[in-house]
Regions:
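Bacterial signal peptide processing site
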Residues: 18-21
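Short, well-ordered beta-strand elements
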Residues: 26-38, 56-62, 129-130
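Short helix-initiation/N-cap motifs at beta->coil->alpha
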Residues: 60-71, 158-186
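Periplasmic-binding protein-like
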Residues: 105-115, 202-243, 263-266
Length: 266
């Protein structure tokens, strides 16, 4: 009886150790990345065959929100994520007491303001209803875009963490509503203006370069990063993914696929 159990236990232990080491069988190693659907998961799909040549099976888990991709990396449900800017990551780390780190910058998504009621920002009426993201980083990003257009004045127009409390002048008496970023495209039929992250704008069928009444210029500092943990940032698999994301093939894909709505950051 014991002679049978001991080899069986050893076999189970060996299988368990193999599963936790990231192996996918046949010498292939897995790497799992959390991402939002557009453009992040689309870009990762293009990277997949590049990593396959390196013996890495890239697996992508798509999320619809901006919280779970970070939570999953912290809790080691996934290895990395690819969806966020540095200001957003810094705010998340500060609020949650986490220590996620940037691996490499990949692309920029110029942030835009959209309307289904008006064709020009000059048509925006007094007391217009405006929806903006409720997370600190993108909330500030929306306000900075409005301030640059002169629709509001901020206490410090260079502060990347400005809030509604920092508005010192609001000549058009804009009425703000703060919502989760993913919800903003759904508000277009009921509000005068919605400030929307490009990934959600693209998913809603909007073309930022044609449909946005206001849009950040190409010098936007809001690069989207591949993000990991201190314990895996130097993992060879992670470094190979970072190199692939900054490859000429991916740069060409971004330029040809998104026509300026998404820009390479390398």
């Amino acid at each position: 009886m014991n002679r049978l159990l001991i080899p069986l236990f050893a076999l189970l232990l060996l299988v368990g150790c193999s599963a936790s080491s990231g192996g996918a069988g046949n010498g292939t190693q897995t790497l799992t990345v959390a991402a939002t659907a557009i453009p992040h998961a689309e870009i990762l799909k293009q990277v997949k065959p590049l990593l396959a040549k390196e013996g890495i099976d890239l697996q992508v888990r798509v999320f619809a929100d901006y919280v779970q991709p970070n939570v999953q990396v912290v809790e080691k449900g996934v290895d990395l994520n690819y969806f966020e800017t540095k200001p957003y990551l810094d705010a998340f780390n500060r609020e949650r007491g986490t220590h996620l780190v940037v691996i490499t910058g990949v692309h920029i998504e110029p942030f835009g303001a959209y309307s289904r009621k008006y064709k020009s920002i000059d048509q925006l009426p007094d007391g217009a209803s405006v929806t903006i993201p409720n997370d600190p980083s993108n909330n500030s990003r929306a306000l900075l875009l409005l301030a640059k257009q002169g629709l509001i004045t901020l206490k410090d127009p260079t502060n990347e963490m400005s809030t509604l409390k920092d508005i010192t002048a609001n000549p058009k008496h804009l009425q703000f509503r703060q919502l989760e970023a993913a919800m903003l495209p759904r508000t277009l039929d009921e509000v005068d203006l919605a400030l929307i992250n490009t990934n959600y704008a693209l998913a809603a069928g909007l073309n930022p370069t044609k449909d946005a009444l206001l849009i950040e210029d190409k010098n936007s500092p809001y690069v989207n990063y591949l993000v990991g943990r201190p314990d895996n940032q130097n993992d060879p698999r992670v470094q190979k993914l970072a190199k692939a994301l900054n490859s000429p093939e991916i740069k060409a894909f971004i330029e040809q696929k998104y026509h300026g709505a998404v820009l390479p950051a390398f």
